[in-house]
């Protein structure tokens, strides 16, 4: 009796799961290429884990919460680690629509890959497009980064304006360079008229150049 029941179940599974069957998906793994010397052997334990991950993904779909590991069937398993699988309905002997299975796999693709230490290129669902990895969120909000950059620019601009004002004020306080030195040099210049040295006229003190005094003016007492 048990042998007959086992044979019946096997026959039903063979009818539901076979290459290119309705709602069936092919999976291909490249364990050696992904892990190198740390590659593991694909055995019945790995098959059980795969079925568990598919059942887990299906239980996330509305109205598919009753999906169990036994509802995930594998067939045509090869040594190069490729196989086909289908997901059967819990109450009836038919496979679930491919669209539901595909949606469930896509939503949990990262979880399935992580379970086998693989990625979308080394664990391939041939009829299911690869999903993009979620974008990395920066640890610091973007608006804080933008605010910090603007604040630094404004601070540098204010500092440059203050330094420029201080330099300009110092230049104004000193006045034009060389003016006082030129005046001093002009006062000390001694001119020569007709071979007679003449002192410049001191306009400030009313000094008279002796070179232009007559003999009477020089001898006339004050």
UniProtKB/Swiss-Prot annotation:
Residue intervals passing through the bilayer: 142-162
Keyword Transmembrane tagged: yes
Segments in the Cytoplasmic topological domain: 163-222
Record topological domains on the Extracellular side: 15-141
Residue ranges annotated for the Collectrin-like domain, each copy included: 21-222
A GO MF label: transporter activator activity
Record membrane topology: Single-pass type I membrane protein
Tissue: Expressed on the apical surface of the proximal tubules in the renal cortex (at protein level). Kidney; collecting ducts and proximal tubule. Pancreas; beta cells of islets. Expressed in the cerebral cortex, hippocampus, brainstem and cerebellum.
Oligomer and partners: Monomer. Homodimer. Homodimer; dimerization prevents CLTRN cleavage by BACE2. Interacts with SNAPIN. Interacts with SLC6A18; this interaction regulates the trafficking of SLC6A18 to the cell membrane and its amino acid transporter activity. Interacts with SLC6A19; this interaction regulates the trafficking of SLC6A19 to the cell membrane and its amino acid transporter activity. Interacts with SLC6A20B.
Name by which UniProt lists this protein: Collectrin
